[in-house]
Amino acid sequence: MEKEKDSKLKQAMKGLDSFLTTHYSFRYNQITEQCEFHDKHKFDKYRVVDEREFNTLVINAIEEGVNCMDRDMRRYLGSSRIPSFHPVTAYLEHLPHWDGHDRVSELARSVSDETQWVEVFHIWMLGMVMQWSGKNRMHGNCLIPILVNPLQGLKKSTFCRSLLPPALRGYYTDDFDVTREGDALRKMRSLALINIDEFNRMEEGKLARLKNLVQMSGLSMRRPFQSSYSQQPRLSSFIGTSHFCDLLTDSSGNRRFYPVMTKGSIRLPRINYKQLYAQLRDELKHNRRYWLSPKEEQAVSLRNDAFLRRPIEESLFYSCFSLPRDEEKFQRWTIGQIYEVMKKASPETMRDVKMRAFGKHLALMGVKKLHTRYGDQYLLNRL
């Protein structure tokens, strides 16, 4: 009886396999973790086997005389019989030979003619493609270009979206919240490019969290229906847009960002995506550098001072204290003493200024300090 049952099951699976491979092509999308298919006779695009399509496949199989049930179809589609497919790496693997024309610099100049920007954008694009390839397991693409202009309608977001070829446009988003860690990590695993729109709205704490995220090469995540965490590869790179110039908060740690003023409405060249990405692929094959050197990081950090967000308490500070000039006498103040003086002068201004951030703000305002056994002491004069 058992042998007869096994024989019927084998026949059913054999019939199902014959029917499906004759009429359809299947693939398992490693990014979305979904089974996709297309009809061989209709030459249509691949689409997800959702519940509706699944039921249609079962009905079609039964109508063709295949003795199968839902569980048989589910077992088949959930097996390794379905070949794996990674849309991003597959795109890179099927690119033509590069014709030698520098399309990356051409694309960068549609935003700005600044020489440093053109070089940094090129490095960032190389980093993005290296991130996609999965070969850089030690470091993530930790640079974020930010397109800046106070005017709206200049196609900043359009430029960001247009960096991806049409075949990969579904792996782009401008919806990203660093405070929702689980969702943020999932998007970093499954999206090719994340645009942080209106970057200037990010609070100081969120910027610090973003800097941590952007340096990750791997992601420690708990997958659906699993109790333990596992290491997942990161796919995404980041870009941003802003209406305001004062968008950075930390003068000592802004080398991860590259704000650039657009020269007006961005006029995108007609992009030959296959040649654009063939250039990047070939440059990486020839070991072109896809990260900033220490000297370049220092230069980026210096130029970014122009994009620093001034502390809200800066005017209050200068109404209470002055910075001593060379050889001028000074007083030593602890950060707590400075904070209390300013809080007494304007409680409303200091209400949202956290002590940890206040220390960074003092450094940003150029306040010198001494390291003593009693802690840091700031050199100031009381007005």
Residue ranges and their predicted role:
Residues 1-101, 115-119, 348-349, 368, ...:
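N-terminal nucleic-acid engagement/recognition segments and initiation subdomains in replication
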Residues 286-329:
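Conserved alpha/beta core segments of nucleic-acid transaction machinery
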